[in-house]
Amino acid sequence: MVQKKIIIVGATSGIGKKMAELYIGKGHMVGITGRRLDLLQQIKQQFPQEVEYECFDVTEKENIRHIQSLIDKLNGLDILVISAGTGEVSKELDWKIDKRTIETNVNGFAEIANWTFNFFIKQDQGRLAVISSIGAVRGNSWAPAYNAAKAFQSTYFEGLAIKARRLKKNVSVTCIEPGFVNTKMAKGNKFFWVVPVEKAAGQIIKAIEKKKRKVYVSRRWWIIAKLLKWMPYFILKRLI
């Protein structure tokens, strides 16, 4: 098996962290990022030979400098996964929450996705993935900015997938739309069809390996996605 150089943006907890662990278990080199230096250092101590890290917040400046630094440390890049995100409920439509959501899930995401896509196009190979959400399908009264931001991510990645195909480059673009995963962000125990984080991470890795354009995690969430997409507004407004 060829060892790959992988960067996971947002890998100190949840799906991102589990993906890093699974990739390491497969013998790959992994670059991780996050806002908390102590958590990054803990992972580095656990896997001193396999892990490199950069500590930064995607809402701040110099995102690309940190990504470039990780590429240098890994001596290359084959796969980049954008897992960083925020999903706080904004029941009272709090602008501070919505602003943070947009800065993280739209601005920070787009800057990294844009730069990485162009990087892969120039080297004529690479796999780019994002952890979006089933929430991308429709609006939600409890977290309007979150669902809107996830819709942006999914639509942006659809555009990148089309662009890569037209450019005839060996670049794959994978959008993952998970349902409820048992992480702190989802507070998964309260919901149905809750997926263990290890299962979710494993399915995502397989989707990236197979160069899938879009996948739902777990797979049966495609049913919910279709129902939501075609659900009349007068029904939707009573549910979410």
Q: Which residues are covered by each model-predicted region?
A:
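Conserved NAD(P)H cofactor-binding loop of Rossmann-fold oxidoreductase domains
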Residues: 83-89
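Residue(s) in the substrate-gating loop at a strand-loop-helix junction
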Residues: 133
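Active-site helix of classical SDR
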Residues: 113, 149
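Short alpha-helical oligomerization interface
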Residues: 90-103
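Conserved glycine-rich cofactor-binding loop
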Residues: 12-13
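C-terminal helical subdomain
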Residues: 175, 187-226
